[in-house]
């Protein structure tokens, strides 16, 4: 199996791939795209292009979409847990009862944060100060992929 990047909703081939190996059996599970700075820049450009439409959606709709992602993960815990166990060597009880369900829970938590982050007013004798939260932009994060 070959796993490509997913940029702008489309699979994108990489210039290089690495093998992911089941640590228990040494079986090659897949060839995974190895990202470059150019790949990150393409993903950031796609995200920037999509950002105005995302930011323009009501917070309740953004929350619904994120909740749906959490539900999708939750419906597939057994399959995702098996894959994670094969990929990382962690026990199936850890991936199936903790790590993968936690990934679903994270989407549910941040979905709720979309609708619960309220601004505050801080009156002073001469001015009205307030906070206002809204989407501000795109960022890229490259981190170890050792848990879902």
Residue ranges with predicted function:
Residues 13-15, 102, 131-134:
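A generic fold-level signal
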Residues 9, 26, 62, 107, ...:
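Residue-level signature of catalytic and energy-coupling elements of molecular machines
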Residues 9, 35, 89, 119, ...:
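Glycine-centered flexibility sites
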Residues 1-25:
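Hydrophobic face of amphipathic alpha-helices that form TPR/SEL1-like repeat modules
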Residues 5, 85, 115, 133-136:
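Short glycine- and Lys/Arg-enriched binding-loop motifs that mark or flank ligand-binding interfaces
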Residues 29-117:
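Glycine-rich loop-to-alpha-helix module at the N-terminal edge of alpha/beta enzyme cores
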Residues 120-148:
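Conserved small-residue-rich beta-alpha loop and adjacent elements
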């Amino acid at each position: 199996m070959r796993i490509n990047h997913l940029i702008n909703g489309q699979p994108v081939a990489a210039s290089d791939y690495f093998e992911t190996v089941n640590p228990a059996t040494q079986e090659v599970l897949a060839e995974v795209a190895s990202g470059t700075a150019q790949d990150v820049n393409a993903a950031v450009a796609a995200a920037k292009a999509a950002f105005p439409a995302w930011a323009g959606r009501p917070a309740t709709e953004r929350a619904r979409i994120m909740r749906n992602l959490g539900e999708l993960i939750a419906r597939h815990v057994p399959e995702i847990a098996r894959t994670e166990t094969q990929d990382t060597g962690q026990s199936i009880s850890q991936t199936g009862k903790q790590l993968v369900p936690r990934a679903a829970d994270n989407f549910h938590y941040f979905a709720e944060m979309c609708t619960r982050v309220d601004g505050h007013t801080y009156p002073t004798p001469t001015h009205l100060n307030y906070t206002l939260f809204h989407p501000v932009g795109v960022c890229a994060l490259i981190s170890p992929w050792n848990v879902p």
